[in-house]
Amino acid sequence: MNTEATHDQNEALTTGARLRNAREQLGLSQQAVAERLCLKVSTVRDIEEDKAPADLASTFLRGYIRSYARLVHIPEEELLPGLEKQAPLRAAKVAPMQSFSLGKRRKKRDGWLMTFTWLVLFVVIGLSGAWWWQDHKAQQEEITTMADQSSAELSSNSEQGQSVPLNTSTTTDPATTSTPPASVDTTATNTQTPAVTAPAPAVDPQQNAVVSPSQANVDTAATPAPTATTTPDGAAPLPTDQAGVTTPAADPNALVMNFTADCWLEVTDATGKKLFSGMQRKDGNLNLTGQAPYKLKIGAPAAVQIQYQGKPVDLSRFIRTNQVARLTLNAEQSPAQ
């Protein structure tokens, strides 16, 4: 009967009261239990008063009660009914996983961003290519028109050049009619001064071309053949022949161009006169003089080297852009666009 009464009394007590009674029977304080279980004194007090801390999960609370029961030698099976009431198991609230959906949404947004970026890049590349093609096509058309104009000018100049000998033949007739009296005088002077006429054969080919009509007139004046060969012009025309042999002074405004490849070129001076317009071949040289400033149009700036007033002209800005060079060379050698 005493055993049954004790069992009924234990069932009437709560879990916290049974743990407190067992602790007091063993002579332990709450501080000693807290130190052995590595818990706070407040946690031990809450367990004995059957309080469930709000910040403590039920799983941890059930574990603390079991450890407390083993410490005070109370079987765990006797405490299970009380544990279900004091610390019932509560399902933890788990937030729905959103990482996958967030990652999917972020990936979709990144996909749109990359698509827009590639679209902008393709548009920029397309516009750049169209601009380059239009500029290149315009340059080619301009070079073609310049070449056509130069060919037309060259053809007109060649037609005018063919009619020049007809005019020169008419102008030389009075000269031939007026030379016989002069030939008589030259024969007389040549007989008196043979030493003066000795260096006459050393004259340049251009002088020989001019003297040939007078020599023909000397032959028609019934003079002997030896005297005709030793009497080119006499003593009087000798200073003019020597003046023709002397080289003229170099023009300070001379424009010298050397070509490393085929290049179309047009040069105009200050008076509007075209000093040159046409195509220059590789390894060609061109020396032009006129009234400064000069206006130049060069189809291939990389194929020509220009010297003005003895100094090279910088064409690097036209070579870098690969454009037709349009520049003006002033008297101070300052090329301007």
Swiss-Prot record:
Highest taxon above the source species: Bacteria
GO cellular component, one term: plasma membrane
Annotated Pfam families: HTH_25, RodZ_C
Biological process, per Gene Ontology: regulation of cell shape
Topological domain spans for side Cytoplasmic: 1-111
Sequence intervals crossing the membrane: 112-132
Broad class of where this protein is predominantly found: membrane
Keyword Cell inner membrane: yes
Region of interest (Disordered), residue spans: 145-237
Domain named HTH cro/C1-type: residues: 19-71
Keywords: Cell inner membrane, Cell membrane, Cell shape, DNA-binding, Membrane, Signal-anchor, Transmembrane, Transmembrane helix
GO molecular function: DNA binding
Residues of the DNA-binding region: 30-49
Membrane topology: Single-pass type II membrane protein
Compartments where located: Cell inner membrane
Protein's UniProt name: Cytoskeleton protein RodZ
Gene giving rise to this polypeptide: rodZ
